[in-house]
């Protein structure tokens, strides 16, 4: 059977339990062999950079996923010495995995609405399938016309014909109901974060004196 690989990118500043729940549900829903968490380098679309360094964010993801064999960390965007664009990351992964591998890129509904502003966005469909994490109230008809056209042409609801790339699959995943901003504020105020973050990650944050 061809490999089934998911891609879950984010700043992960810090990585927390909502990220992990979403990654595991992503793997479950699509019967993936592996989900690669890809910490962003310097995000080109954000004015404010990450609070923790690239190396620290990478360390935290490694600690958070250590007990789950289906989750892996991918360092390519951290190691890239230039802005990291999704199309470049997926192109590299496709070259490494081969044409037959089933590649899934996880995207939120808000990001999907802005997809046409991404670099070479139409090429994404040649490289991967898109898994859309649906939020309550998400309405595909409200997408920009060019994105909605792709939705209509590519959206699938079952796996009667799994393909290596080119489809859009809406998924009802656990919401990211914890923001990293709120978590950083709790850490800065020395408020309890039990159940919100992996204990090994919390110990690392305290050793490194992050988010003070």
From Swiss-Prot:
EC number(s) given by UniProt: 2.7.7.18
Sequence similarity: Belongs to the NadD family.
SUPFAM superfamilies: Nucleotidylyl transferase (SSF52374)
Catalytic activity: nicotinate beta-D-ribonucleotide + ATP + H(+) = deamido-NAD(+) + diphosphate
Alphabetized Pfam families for the sequence: CTP_transf_like
Purpose: Catalyzes the reversible adenylation of nicotinate mononucleotide (NaMN) to nicotinic acid adenine dinucleotide (NaAD).
GO biological process, one term: NAD biosynthetic process
Protein's name according to its UniProt entry: Probable nicotinate-nucleotide adenylyltransferase
Organism, as annotated: Chromobacterium violaceum (strain ATCC 12472 / DSM 30191 / JCM 1249 / CCUG 213 / NBRC 12614 / NCIMB 9131 / NCTC 9757 / MK)
Keywords annotated in UniProt: ATP-binding, NAD, Nucleotide-binding, Nucleotidyltransferase, Pyridine nucleotide biosynthesis, Transferase
Signal peptide: none
